[in-house]
Design a protein with these regions (language model features):
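Ser/Thr-rich, low-complexity intrinsically disordered terminal regions
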Residues: 2-7, 12-77, 81-125
Length: 125
């Protein structure tokens, strides 16, 4: 399962508080195709240790995939992964890019955050 672990996290909820709806459009000139990644809504649990981000991905005019990205806080770490209940069947490049984008947004908010364990290195560059 694709995941990213962020370490040295001091303020988990800053992302929740600063979240804005966003649409990423990735153009592939070679194939002349577009990929759309849309971050729609964000939810937090009562304990404020889990955040869910509703995400929609459309690739090459295929059926859209709707799923939630889960960010879980444990100690000074955050694990970013796909929510198991809405896990998309096709873990395409766009799905993996959406996870990496959330990690990049956390790093933008807090530059002291480091990337720990991940199987998405190529999407974090």
């Amino acid at each position: 399962m694709p995941h990213i672990v962020l370490t040295n996290v001091s303020d988990f909820n800053s992302f929740y508080n600063k979240f804005k709806k966003e649409v990423l459009i990735i153009k592939n000139e070679k194939d002349q195709t577009n990929t759309i990644i849309r971050f729609e809504e964000i939810f937090s649990n009562q304990l404020k240790n889990i955040i869910l981000i509703k995400t929609i991905v459309i690739e090459n005019t295929n059926q859209p995939q709707t799923y939630y990205i889960m960010a879980m806080k444990k100690n000074n770490q955050i694990t970013i992964r796909l929510d198991p209940l809405t896990d998309p069947k096709n873990k395409t490049d766009a799905v993996k890019i959406s996870l990496a984008n959330i990690a990049k947004q956390y790093k933008k908010i807090d530059p002291a955050i480091s990337i720990g364990k991940t199987n998405l290195e190529q999407y974090l560059l």
